[in-house]
């Protein structure tokens, strides 16, 4: 079994202990002051509203047969989840009933991988894989201290890898559980997906109230004023977010499930955040930007993390309804990359496209552009979808990120990324 780095539990400092004890802020208790609340019972969640149609670009644009599409997706899943552990797989079982997704290149486990892996498992009906990933994630949650309820992870900033509580993975995991509830509900003795989703959504929504304020620099997941998700739940991230962690489609589903109007407001704020962050000519998005859309120095280029924003833009259009800006954005981005050469464009650029910052032709970007092409209207969209079809998951050290992006793009382009 591959080795992996595990984030140590946060130490409980005296001040945090005293504050948490005085407020009685366990995840099953009423919170602080007049903002107190009780976790919702998963049974009270409303059903999600699925769109009536999921376009299948592989079939309807490329003319691929259903059998060929099914075989391609099965091959990708089997390679990533059950392939050769030394060169193909990123999913590994541990203990009797758990599993994790390994970032092979960095030799660590990230909540982004766990969350995307759970989404893939729900969409493909792989309940055993889903349950194993969730049990691993739940076992790794901070059990006490200011970060109680968050998941430990690792993040990159430039070439630096650091421990973090990454909102990207937290949001993916919560949404995967919500979709699992819609697909399978909960049989006696099995995981109560609705209850687990409710607990995570309450953590996301009310973490700061649970802590009776900001404790040891730990904040809530969302800024209550702008209604944007923080880059990290820390005061160090005040006024900063990432386009890749804005997920308005998810927030609209959370509104449907909980009835909380905050989530629709967060969805609108996220869409506007994309608009003000994207370059008006190329459509390229920075890694980080202030809440007002100004790129953050040192994170002001379009590189690998930014690719994930494209999937979120597409899902918002597919799941929630027509988003005219999303179509325009897709056209801008694909026109830019078509001008760079569909088979040769680089993996990183300055936002205006004038400077290459990563010359590698990245499979993960081919996948993201292929997904964008689903909602684009320019003629070149066909070439981007075809390029995505011809991708096979990478083998070797870099297979984690590209493999997950390819799997997501295949589900989106085959009409199999659905709401349950």
Question: Predicted segments — roles?
Answer:
Residues 132-139, 172-179, 185, 191-209:
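Active-site-adjacent structural elements in enzyme catalytic domains
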Residues 2-13:
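Bacterial N-terminal signal peptides that target proteins for export
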Residues 115-127, 137:
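Alpha-helical support elements that line or immediately flank enzyme active sites
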Residues 124-125, 181-188, 255, 317, ...:
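Short coil/turn linking the two alpha-helices of tandem helical-hairpin repeats
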Residues 388-397:
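Solenoid-like repeat scaffolds
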């Amino acid at each position: 079994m591959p080795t992996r780095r595990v984030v140590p539990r946060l130490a409980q400092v005296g001040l945090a202990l005293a504050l948490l004890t005085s407020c009685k802020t366990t995840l099953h208790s009423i919170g602080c002051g007049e903002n107190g609340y009780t976790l919702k019972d998963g049974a009270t969640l409303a059903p999600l509203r699925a769109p009536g149609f999921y376009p299948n670009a592989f079939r309807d644009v490329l003319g691929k047969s259903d059998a060929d599409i099914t075989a391609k997706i099965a091959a990708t899943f089997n390679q990533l989840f059950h392939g050769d552990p030394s060169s193909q797989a990123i999913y590994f079982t541990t203990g009797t009933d758990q599993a994790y997704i390994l970032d092979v290149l960095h030799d660590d486990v990230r909540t982004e991988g766990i969350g995307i892996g759970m989404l893939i498992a729900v969409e493909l009906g792989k309940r055993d894989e889903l349950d194993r990933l969730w049990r691993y994630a739940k076992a790794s949650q901070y059990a006490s201290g200011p970060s109680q309820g968050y998941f430990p992870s690792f993040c990159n900033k430039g070439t630096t890898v650091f421990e973090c509580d990454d909102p990207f993975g937290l949001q993916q995991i919560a949404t995967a559980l919500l979709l699992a509830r819609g697909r399978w509900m909960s049989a006696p003795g099995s995981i109560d997906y609705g209850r687990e989703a409710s607990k995570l959504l309450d953590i996301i929504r009310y973490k700061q109230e649970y802590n009776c304020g900001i404790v040891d620099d730990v904040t809530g997941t969302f800024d209550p004023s702008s209604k944007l998700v923080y880059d990290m739940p820390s005061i160090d991230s005040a006024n900063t977010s990432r386009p890749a962690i804005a997920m308005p489609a998810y927030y609209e589903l959370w509104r449907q499930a909980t009835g909380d109007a905050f989530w629709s407001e967060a969805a609108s704020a996220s869409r506007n955040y994309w608009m003000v962050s994207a370059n008006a000519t190329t459509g390229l998005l920075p890694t980080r930007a202030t809440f007002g859309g100004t790129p953050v120095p040192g994170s002001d280029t379009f590189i690998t993390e930014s690719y994930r924003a494209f999937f979120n833009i597409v899902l918002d259009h597919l799941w929630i309804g027509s988003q005219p800006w999303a179509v325009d954005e897709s056209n801008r981005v694909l026109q830019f990359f078509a001008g760079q050469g569909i088979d040769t464009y680089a993996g990183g650029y300055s936002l205006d496209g004038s400077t290459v910052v990563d010359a590698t032709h990245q499979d993960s970007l081919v996948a993201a552009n292929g997904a964008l092409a689903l909602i684009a209207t320019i003629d070149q969209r066909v070439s981007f979808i075809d390029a995505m079809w011809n991708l096979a998951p990478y083998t070797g050290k870099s297979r984690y990120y590209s493999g997950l992006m390819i799997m997501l793009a295949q589900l989106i382009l085959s009409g199999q990324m659905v709401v349950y």
